[in-house]
């Protein structure tokens, strides 16, 4: 099991980063908030979890152990795979997720694309007493950029998560045309989080 990766950041994309450690480049799938802390060419460390399947081994990276532990807790729930667990942590930061579980807030969980009412109820039932008390928020906001500059990146990330291109474009445009983009600058990670939340509501 690989618990963390430290080294030079070779690449930062919307859903993953490549970090070179001991001469080996590791592709690490990560949440928008974790990716927002990385800069190409700089040194970085991500706490990781490895998911092993019959035909693959995939690393998932997080800014801290709390997010990694929540990811692993979500994976323990029947019907929740890595993609859905990562989408949950993209929509809700650690503190918000813990609060939703503590409050049995099914409605908040159904904002995550792919989680319906029954799935949310199952997550609450199985994790409410396992995740511990609500801690401080670890949400990191990415560097602001012009809305037009991030549109293509957000659409690409949504398509990568399994949404149809038209659906992804409409959600992204709605986010950038709304309150988030009214000042002409928006963080890519914030736009992606908002689009995911919107898609969860309109599913």
From Swiss-Prot:
Start and end residues of each stretch annotated as Flexible linker: 133-147
Annotated binding of DNA, by residue: 79-80, 83, 114-116, 118
Segments of this protein annotated with the region Domain I: 1-65
Single annotated GO MF: four-way junction helicase activity
Keyword flag Transmembrane: no
Example of a GO biological process term: DNA recombination
Motif (Acidic pin): 54-55
Primary residence: cytoplasm
Keywords: Cytoplasm, DNA damage, DNA recombination, DNA repair, DNA-binding
Secretion signal span: none
Coiled coil region boundaries: none
SUPFAM superfamilies: DNA helicase RuvA subunit, C-terminal domain, Nucleic acid-binding proteins, RuvA domain 2-like
Oligomer status and interactors: Homotetramer, forms a dimer of homotetramers around Holliday junction DNA. The tetramers make direct protein-protein contact, DNA contacts both tetramers. Forms a complex with RuvB. Forms an RuvA(8)-RuvB(12)-Holliday junction (HJ) complex. HJ DNA is sandwiched between 2 RuvA tetramers; dsDNA enters through RuvA and exits via RuvB. An RuvB hexamer assembles on each DNA strand where it exits the tetramer. Each RuvB hexamer is contacted by two RuvA subunits (via domain III) on 2 adjacent RuvB subunits; this complex drives branch migration.
Family, per entry: Belongs to the RuvA family.
Function (record text): The RuvA-RuvB-RuvC complex processes Holliday junction (HJ) DNA during genetic recombination and DNA repair, while the RuvA-RuvB complex plays an important role in the rescue of blocked DNA replication forks via replication fork reversal (RFR). RuvA specifically binds to HJ cruciform DNA, conferring on it an open structure. The RuvB hexamer acts as an ATP-dependent pump, pulling dsDNA into and through the RuvAB complex. HJ branch migration allows RuvC to scan DNA until it finds its consensus sequence, where it cleaves and resolves the cruciform DNA.
Protein name as annotated: Holliday junction branch migration complex subunit RuvA
Source species: Mycobacterium leprae (strain TN)
């Amino acid at each position: 099991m690989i618990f963390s990766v430290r080294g030079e950041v070779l690449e930062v994309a919307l859903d993953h980063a490549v970090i070179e450690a001991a001469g080996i480049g590791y592709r690490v799938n990560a949440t928008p908030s974790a990716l927002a802390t990385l800069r190409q060419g700089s040194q970085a460390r991500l706490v990781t979890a490895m998911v092993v399947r019959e035909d693959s081994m995939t690393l998932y990276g997080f800014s801290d152990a709390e997010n990694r532990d929540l990811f692993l807790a979500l994976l323990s729930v029947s019907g929740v795979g890595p993609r859905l667990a990562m989408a949950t942590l993209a929509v809700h930061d650690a503190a918000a997720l813990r609060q939703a579980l503590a409050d049995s807030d099914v409605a908040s969980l159904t904002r995550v694309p792919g989680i319906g009412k029954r799935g949310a109820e199952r997550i609450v039932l199985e994790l409410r007493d396992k995740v511990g008390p609500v801690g401080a928020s670890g949400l990191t906001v990415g560097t602001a950029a012009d809305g037009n500059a991030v549109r293509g990146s957000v659409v690409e990330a949504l398509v990568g998560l399994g949404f149809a291109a038209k659906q992804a474009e409409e959600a992204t445009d709605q986010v950038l045309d709304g309150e988030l983009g009214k000042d002409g600058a928006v963080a890519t990670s914030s736009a992606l989080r908002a689009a995911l939340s919107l898609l969860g509501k309109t599913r």
